[in-house]
């Protein structure tokens, strides 16, 4: 076994440099600023007052003996009542006033829901309309604001004058009339009192004359009061302008037309429903064949007798002999003119039975040259077998 030679001095220096390079981590973390500690901390804590970094043990103000601990003050935060954002309050003196002032400044500048920043809306001046637009649309004639639907003069029945509230003039007239009536009543009462005083002074001399005069004066005063009351009642009535009356009449006509249209539409819908229901009616028809067998099918109310005939010809089991259809085994058969009539018109709803009466084709073929108006010639024949006559 060969013995390893001890490392030389330059080799030892190279190893020490390599170890220093591998284990040196000063560029990653931060050392604690406490002189007795100086721990390398990879997640240091920064002090708010002295702006220095410390380890976990010395992060508190008292642990690292912070010099700026006297500068610390209590901080108060108040939420905004609109956006719920926290607002810092700097001074503690007069908290109520400072909080109100800070909140008002915040709402005027930084608040999200600031009313001054919100877009304005313009309401339509038409009474029946309640829409509002973000753009002001004025009429050229009456110069009042309307929505996009009623912006044209024909849509809002423009009169060419600015719109005034309909109750403004009548209220003013009623107030003036009431004031005038009150003044007239006061003057009348004063005159009555004067007349009564004069009459009382002259009662000793002319009792009869004074009584007559008093009665006359009282009657006159009563008449005046009645007239004034009647005038006040008449004046209290609202005097509408002519344009508003026209608008009221037009609105009534418009609503009456709408009612008439609705009633007509309801009638049409009822008729359509009746037609639809009638078309959905089903008639159950049973057919007894010449051999006594029975076939049955559900036909619609609008189906004709020809469709019944086609069903019989495609589903019969009694052969190919000619037949006539009857409602009774000994009754009159249906004629050719009744082929295009519906089941409802023939009275076969809701349930009915038809009988197939056999016919002799040879007799009908021989008698076809004669002009006999017998019922058998007009009877309903399903079809004739042309090969039967050429035996």
Swiss-Prot record:
Q: Where is the UBX domain?
A: 278-356
Compositional bias, Low complexity, is annotated for 1-16, 185-236
Task: List, in alphabetical order, the Gene Ontology terms for molecular function in this entry.
Answer: zinc ion binding
Output the superkingdom of the source species.
Eukaryota
UniProt cross-references to InterPro entries, sorted A to Z: AN1-like_Znf, Ubiquitin-like_domsf, UBX_dom, Znf_AN1
Say yes or no: keyword Repeat present. Answer: yes
**Residue ranges, annotated region (Disordered):** 1-20, 185-240
- Keywords attached to this entry: Metal-binding, Repeat, Zinc, Zinc-finger
Could you say which residue ranges form the zinc fingers (AN1-type)? 26-74, 118-166
What residues bind Zn(2+) 2, as annotated? 47, 50, 64, 66
Binding positions for Zn(2+) 3 per the UniProt entry: 124, 129, 147, 150
Which Gene Ontology CC terms are recorded? Answer: cytoplasm
Q: Name one Pfam family in it.
A: zf-AN1
Q: Which residues bind Zn(2+) 4?
A: 139, 142, 156, 158
Enumerate the residues binding Zn(2+) 1: 32, 37, 55, 58
What is the protein's name according to its record? Answer: AN1-type zinc finger and UBX domain-containing protein DDB_G0268260
């Amino acid at each position: 076994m060969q013995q390893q030679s001890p490392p030389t001095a330059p080799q030892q220096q190279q190893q020490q440099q390599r170890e220093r390079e591998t284990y040196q981590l000063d560029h990653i973390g931060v050392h604690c600023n406490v002189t007795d500690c100086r721990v390398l901390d990879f997640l240091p804590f920064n002090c708010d007052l002295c702006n220095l970094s410390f380890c976990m043990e010395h992060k508190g103000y008292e642990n690292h003996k912070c010099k700026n601990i006297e500068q610390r003050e209590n901080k108060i935060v108040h939420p905004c009542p609109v956006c719920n954002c926290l607002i810092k309050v700097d001074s503690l003196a007069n908290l109520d006033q400072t909080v109100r002032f800070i909140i008002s400044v915040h709402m005027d500048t930084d608040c999200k829901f600031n009313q001054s920043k919100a877009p304005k809306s313009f309401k339509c001046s038409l009474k029946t309309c309640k829409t509002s637009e973000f753009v002001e649309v004025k009429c050229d004639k009456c110069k009042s604001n309307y929505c996009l639907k009623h912006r044209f003069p024909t849509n809002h029945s423009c009169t060419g004058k600015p719109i005034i509230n309909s109750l403004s003039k009548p209220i003013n007239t009623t107030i003036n009339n009431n004031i005038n009536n009150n003044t007239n009543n006061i003057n009348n009462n004063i005159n009555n009192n004067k007349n009564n005083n004069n009459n009382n002074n002259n009662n000793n001399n002319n009792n009869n004359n004074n009584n007559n005069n008093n009665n006359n004066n009282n009657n006159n005063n009563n008449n005046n009061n009645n007239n004034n009351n009647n005038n006040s009642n008449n004046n209290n009535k609202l005097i509408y302008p002519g344009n508003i009356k026209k608008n009221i009449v037009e609105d009534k006509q418009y609503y009456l037309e709408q009612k008439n249209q609705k009633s007509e539409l309801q009638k049409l819908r009822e008729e359509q429903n009746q037609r639809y229901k009638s078309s959905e009616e089903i008639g159950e028809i049973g057919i007894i064949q010449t051999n006594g067998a029975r076939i049955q099918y559900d036909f619609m109310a609008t189906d004709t007798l020809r469709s019944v005939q086609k069903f019989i010809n495609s589903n019969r089991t009694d052969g190919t002999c000619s037949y006539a259809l009857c409602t009774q085994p000994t009754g009159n058969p249906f004629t050719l003119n009744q082929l295009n009539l519906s089941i409802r018109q023939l009275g076969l709803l809701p349930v009915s039975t038809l009988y197939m009466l056999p016919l002799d084709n040879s007799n009908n073929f021989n008698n076809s040259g004669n002009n006999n108006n017998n019922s058998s010639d007009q009877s309903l024949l399903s079809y004739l077998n042309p090969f039967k006559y050429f035996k």
